[in-house]
Amino acid sequence: MTELGDWVSIDPDSDKPLFDQLRVQIIDGIRDGRLSPGTRLPTVRELATHVGLAVNTVARSYRELEAAGVLETRGRFGTFVARADPADAAMAAAANSFAEAARSLGISRDDALRYIESALD
């Protein structure tokens, strides 16, 4: 298990929500190699105690990262860094959300792709 709490820094005075600060720092830790794929993370309660956050705040960060495919929970064994590239998982989640929104608004595939191309330019 990694000592995630040793390098996570939460700024309670920031405009950015606490759960999002933690979420971003976990992603950064994966990208820069501090957290390798398969690394077991501290339990929600352990990390909350170590960094001084509420249990629900840490749980929300873990849930959102799990939904994006960045983390995976293996029942009673704990929460681990997923084996997939977090950028791939995050982009897939964003693409799925965009596609869902486009479908619900009745936007055609071609029009939806034009929105993407315009946003990338």
Curated annotation (Swiss-Prot):
Any one Gene Ontology MF annotation carried by this entry is:
DNA binding
Q: Which UniProt keywords apply?
A: Cell wall, Cytoplasm, DNA-binding, Secreted, Transcription, Transcription regulation
The residues covered by the HTH gntR-type domain are 16-84
- The feature table lists the DNA-binding region at 44-63
* Gene null: resulting phenotype: Deletion of the gene has no effect on the growth, morphology and intracellular structure of the cells. The deletion mutant is more sensitive to vancomycin. Disruption promotes resistance to aminoglycosides via manipulating purine metabolism.
The entry's cellular-component GO terms read: cytoplasm; extracellular region
The record's subcellular location field reads: Cytoplasm; Secreted, Cell wall
Role noted for this protein: Transcriptional regulator that modulates resistance to vancomycin and aminoglycosides. Negatively regulates the expression of several genes responsive to vancomycin, resulting in decreased susceptibility of bacteria to vancomycin. Negatively regulates the expression of genes encoding the ribosome binding protein Hsp, the small subunit of sulfate adenylyltransferase CysD, the L-lysine-epsilon aminotransferase LAT and the protease HtpX. Also modulates purine metabolism and aminoglycoside antibiotic resistance.
What protein name does the entry list? HTH-type transcriptional regulator MSMEG_5174/MSMEI_5040
Q: What is the species listed in this Swiss-Prot or TrEMBL entry?
A: Mycolicibacterium smegmatis (strain ATCC 700084 / mc(2)155)
Q: What is the lineage of its organism?
A: Bacteria, Bacillati, Actinomycetota, Actinomycetes, Mycobacteriales
